[in-house]
Amino acid sequence: MYQNITISGLPGAGSTTLLQHLKLVLKDEGWQGFSGGEFMRAYATEKGYFDPSSGGHHDATVYSDEFDREVDMDMRSKLMSEKKWVLESWLSGFLAQQVPGVLKVLMVCSNKAVRIDRIVNRDAISPDLALANMNNRYEKNLKKWQRVYAQEWQDWVVAPNRVKSSDPIDFWRQDLYDVVIDTYSVSQLEATNIVLNAIKSTQ
């Protein structure tokens, strides 16, 4: 039985939108939602690490490894000890590895142009800036997290034989997730129903 949900996905894949839909649909049943990206963006803006008027989003290198881990491990703690959370962040599915009762959802968009267009509309920036921001954040975040979470990758993913020790650290490997939704061919309403049906199927 699924007691919590994680939603992971790279920018433009629709993970934040899915969180918003699920919060609305599940609120009467006592579910709560948390967006790691929105929390970190507010923190970075408050501390002056990021100027929201500059367009685009910041990358994870603007704050310390310690703060990054603190926020992430708090999410893992919620998944281990609490119920009825929908946690959305780049790494939430990775943080849920080996935690029982968590439905791990990965949002993807197989059409890169569609992802870019969504970021353009979300951030009111040019397609060129959206592409550059998307690629820059991915490269910097992945490099940082591969270093910061190398031991957790070994403990949570390699040791349980989910992947080979020689495989590169890839937090968004589809085989680490319970549900993978391609929002290029699946609408947000359909995506919401897929998740709801997955939860109900185990009740």
What are the functions of these language-model segments?
Residues 4:
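Walker A (P-loop) ATP-phosphate-binding motif of ABC ATPase nucleotide-binding domains
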Residues 7:
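Hydrophobic anchor at the beta1->P-loop junction of P-loop NTPases
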Residues 10:
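P-loop (Walker A) phosphate-binding loop of NTP-binding proteins
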Residues 16:
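Walker A/P-loop
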Residues 24-33:
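Post-Walker A helix-loop "phosphate-sensing" segment adjacent to the P-loop in P-loop NTPases
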Residues 36-98, 113, 124-132, 139-141:
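ATP-dependent small-molecule kinase phosphotransfer cores
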Residues 127-191:
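Small-molecule kinase domains that catalyze NTP-dependent phosphoryl transfer to phosphate-bearing small molecules
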